[in-house]
């Protein structure tokens, strides 16, 4: 089995063993990042074209602010209306799959890459990856880290500075290091924000503004 196939299958692999396909992907990754991060700040169109040409899947109306960093890029899938703010890092030695309407605040890091606990085996330059899956309608606060193998459900808020080491269920607010569920997002919470939104739209109508 080639080292790339081992890597993408969450098996131990060695980056020191020659694998032409993996090396070609790494080269293309560098070219992609050079182009992406050299765009002008307001050139959203070019950045969208670049990620559509390199990510595994991209839904409608994505927006990623530069700088952006990744291990490969071609193992990343993002759904509709995906937004990543400044300095997002995705280490995608295994697949990263993100749903619709997901917001990443500045300095969010999503890691699929891992190293053996054994120092002896680490010294042999063996590594592994575990996929990360994020559902729909998720907001991840700034400076948060999503660790290898984590699954985050849908309709979730992750508080700033969280270190997510275990799965997070749907419909909750979670935060901390390690990240834990704080409370459920219940009907009362939904009603509170609906009332705030209704007030906002009422103000727009009074001002003669339509969206």
Residue spans for each PLM region:
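Terminal amphipathic alpha-helical/low-complexity segments used for targeting or macromolecular assembly
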Residues: 1-61, 179-183, 187-211
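Gly/Ser/Thr-rich helix-start
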Residues: 11, 142, 160-162, 177
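Flexible, glycine/small-residue-enriched loop-and-beta-strand segment within the central core
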Residues: 41, 68-78, 83-151, 177-178, ...
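Arg/Lys-rich RNA-binding interfaces used to dock onto structured RNA substrates
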Residues: 50, 66-69
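Short, T/G/N/S-enriched strand-turn elements that build extracellular solenoid repeat scaffolds
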Residues: 53, 76-78, 168
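A generic "structured core" feature
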Residues: 63, 133-135, 139, 151, ...
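Acidic, glycine-centered active-site loop in nucleotide-sugar glycosyltransferases
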Residues: 169-170, 175-178
